């Protein structure tokens, strides 16, 4: 499926709910109004639309939110997506709080991989970012995912004055674990617009000073992590890798291959809504 800019779109993000059980300062702080229940698409409607996208060439679906695991029966949605002809991969982005308890059902449904948000390794910083005391449950979810063997990526948003002093420690999680730790630049939109950005190039320089052998992965090797905007680096001997998504300083719009379907059924291409 090609858009008006002749980009090949084959990746669909489904925002299955606007609800979340965290209140991250840059995403959904306290006071954000939730949608009326009848305004949110049913799973049947999501599956019907996903099937139409598959007929147009979409082969990968990512289930997101809000927090997708707060919506009951999301494993049934995953199973339904996996049954659609042409859909070869179904993945999920989650904050991890409910992951440990729901992972068996998700694996049985055919979930192919999971991305888990983790901005800090310190419980008190986690609570300051999210306004919730859920750090232990997130780490439990990460451990459960790693133990299950499902491919795991950790997503971290570097934040000035919040977690900038522990970014090397977060990157080092990839040293002894078979996962990708990805650093995503703060987007200057919504609540993040008032927050300064720590750039991907700045982080790469920091990590190269910490680990002199820190170097980019060959394109053929990093291709196995998906065809998104992340650029991957590693250190010889590490079990995992470190990725950078330069949402501000990068220039990857021309090669974008994805669209988002919001929980209300709006189609989002970049920052445009249809």
Where are these regions (language model features)?
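N-terminal [4Fe-4S]-dependent radical SAM core
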Residues: 1-13, 23-25, 55, 230-241, ...
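Canonical Radical SAM [4Fe-4S] cluster-binding loop centered on the CxxxCxxC motif
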Residues: 4-44
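Conserved, mostly hydrophobic/aromatic
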Residues: 16, 20, 24, 63, ...
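Short, small-residue-enriched loops and turns at beta-alpha junctions
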Residues: 16, 35, 67-71, 159-162, ...
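Short cysteine clusters
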Residues: 20, 24-27, 253-256, 270
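Radical SAM/AdoMet-radical enzyme domain recognition
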Residues: 40-63, 70-184
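A C-terminal junction/extension of Radical SAM enzymes
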Residues: 167, 173-176, 180-263
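Conserved small/polar residues in nucleotide/adenosyl-binding loops
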Residues: 272-274
């Amino acid at each position: 499926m090609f858009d008006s800019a002749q980009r090949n779109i084959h990746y669909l993000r489904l925002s299955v709910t606007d609800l979340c059980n965290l209140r991250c300062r840059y995403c959904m702080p306290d006071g954000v109004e939730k949608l009326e229940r009848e305004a949110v698409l049913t799973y049947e409607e999501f599956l019907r639309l996903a099937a139409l996208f598959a007929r147009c060439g979409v082969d990968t679906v990512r289930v997101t939110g809000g927090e997708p695991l707060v919506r009951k029966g999301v494993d049934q949605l995953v199973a339904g997506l996996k049954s659609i002809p042409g859909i070869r991969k179904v993945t999920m982005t989650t904050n991890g709080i409910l992951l440990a308890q729901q992972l068996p059902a998700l694996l049985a449904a055919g979930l192919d991989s999971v991305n888990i948000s983790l901005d800090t390794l310190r419980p008190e910083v986690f609570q300051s970012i999210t306004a919730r005391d859920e750090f232990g449950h997130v780490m439990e979810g990460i451990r459960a995912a790693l133990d299950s063997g499902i491919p795991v990526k950790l997503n971290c948003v570097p934040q000035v004055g919040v977690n900038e002093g522990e970014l090397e420690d977060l990157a080092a999680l990839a040293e002894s674990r078979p996962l990708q730790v990805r650093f995503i630049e703060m987007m200057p939109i919504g609540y993040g617009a008032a927050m300064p950005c720590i750039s991907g190039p700045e982080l790469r320089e920091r990590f190269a000073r910490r680990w002199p052998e820190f170097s980019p992965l060959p394109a053929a090797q990093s291709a196995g992590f998906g065809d998104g905007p992340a650029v991957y680096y590693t250190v010889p001997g590490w079990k995992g890798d470190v990725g950078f998504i330069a949402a501000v300083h990068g220039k990857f719009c021309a090669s974008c291959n994805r669209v988002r379907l919001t929980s209300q059924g709006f189609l989002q291409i970049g920052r445009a809504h249809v």
